């Protein structure tokens, strides 16, 4: 056989592999409004940068008629490429090949990509579209899942891991995305659940649709399992590229800086008009973020889950920062179980990858109620406290209005190790809100008053003027300065420059025991 013959043979084999499950199954994928695995990779990566691993690998199973079944690439496409010129590793389940079911070789290919990503120090992107375990391979499939889960855990905090759910993801397969840093879902076409609607109906009698049980809306607004939901696969892939622009390649690199387009000395006078004079009147914390961050740079995370706290990425003078902010428009910005978990997880991600954290505080306390207490608000609220306390990245805090009680401590206070703490003149920093304090401190006087309501209003105003202000905390050094809102942006940019070389180490230990 000549070299020309051998090259022709190679090209034929490669062409066969590129067809996946064949034209009929590719057409079926398109009919469902879904791209194929290769189309997703080609769309996601910079043009011409994808280099595939193990294109010719296939299963080793000879039971249940599998010896007669050819599975190109064993149903998964793996390799590396570039996003905006930076290396990423990617795997994509190929639903056209045996439903993208996971077998032994399938798992080995994914593990190889994950191992290489950790060696190189580059993000891993998983494009999930799989029917689940390959039953024909039995326990070998379960072993494959376990190998992937272990690598997800080992890679956590080492390289960014991002999952996109672009079809079914059921049973044990759901745990790999759950172990990654961010999960994207596509409305109407992607689903995640451990037990499906049929099993639930058989066991409990409950009837539920796929979307109600594990659709994108369910997991972004109710369970919090997913971080982003998009209308199309293309939008999901575009958003992943955008997310990567804020992130470093690994845990020993700093996040990338883009060329700034917004004046670092810009004075945001509009911030003076945002916080209402009435302490109970809500406002949108996004208006504050838009005035402080580089224009148009905020990228929200989990926007539909636990809306009383806002988290996401932004830029200050081109530098990536993580944002954690109470949202006064939702439940007055109180902290509850879901908000505490959402904030804690995001803080720990930022700390893992050297992303400074900027916190905006307007919190009247933790949400009261038997439901919160019985479901463990003490334990869950402690997660947020724990996350801030263990963080070693630069921590900058701005108190815009309320900072009451234990919630003041929890929200990146100086006592937890924040580097820079500012308060606006509208800040009310106190052990509790004026109304509650007055009811306790002046109970006897109020009971004896001719007009208790009028006297209560007078005492509340006196308490607010004397105690619920930023100056007592400033006198104690609990805030570094009381600043005009318009100066917030340029002060924080200067502080970020100052903190760039921050080095903080924690006591030697295997790992902490966060109150899970």
Swiss-Prot record:
It catalyses: propanoyl-CoA + hydrogencarbonate + ATP = (S)-methylmalonyl-CoA + ADP + phosphate + H(+). Residues 1-32 are annotated as: Disordered. SUPFAM superfamilies: ClpP/crotonase (SSF52096). Keywords: Ligase, Lyase. Pfam families: Carboxyl_trans. It comes from the Archaea. The keyword Isomerase does not apply. Disruption phenotype: Cells lacking pccB and pccX genes accumulate a high level of propionyl-CoA, which would then inhibit CoA-dependent enzymes such as succinyl-CoA synthetase and could partially inhibit the TCA cycle. Also affected in growth and glucose utilization. Cells are unable to produce PHBV and show morphological abnormalitiess such as a decrease of PHBV granules. GO terms for molecular function: lyase activity; propionyl-CoA carboxylase activity. Residues 263-509 form the CoA carboxyltransferase C-terminal domain. It is an enzyme of class 6 (ligase). Residues 3-259 form the CoA carboxyltransferase N-terminal domain. PROSITE patterns: COA_CT_CTER, COA_CT_NTER. InterPro entries: AccD/PCCB, AcCoA_carboxyl_beta, ClpP/crotonase-like_dom_sf, COA_CT_C, COA_CT_N. Its EC number is 6.4.1.3. GO terms for cellular component: acetyl-CoA carboxylase complex. Pathway: Metabolic intermediate metabolism; propanoyl-CoA degradation; succinyl-CoA from propanoyl-CoA: step 1/3. PANTHER family: PROPIONYL-COA CARBOXYLASE BETA CHAIN, PROPIONYL-COA CARBOXYLASE BETA CHAIN, MITOCHONDRIAL. The propionyl coenzyme A carboxylase (PCC) complex is composed of three subunits: PccA (biotin carboxylase and biotin-carboxyl carrier), PccB (carboxyltransferase) and PccX. Part of the propionyl coenzyme A carboxylase (PCC) complex involved in propionate utilization and in the production of the poly(3-hydroxybutyrate-co-3-hydroxyvalerate)(PHBV), which is a water-insoluble biopolymer used as intracellular energy reserve material when cells grow under conditions of nutrient limitation. The complex catalyzes the carboxylation of propionyl-CoA to methylmalonyl-CoA. PCC is also able to catalyze the carboxylation of acetyl-CoA. Belongs to the AccD/PCCB family. This is Propionyl-CoA carboxylase, carboxyltransferase subunit. It comes from Haloferax mediterranei (strain ATCC 33500 / DSM 1411 / JCM 8866 / NBRC 14739 / NCIMB 2177 / R-4).
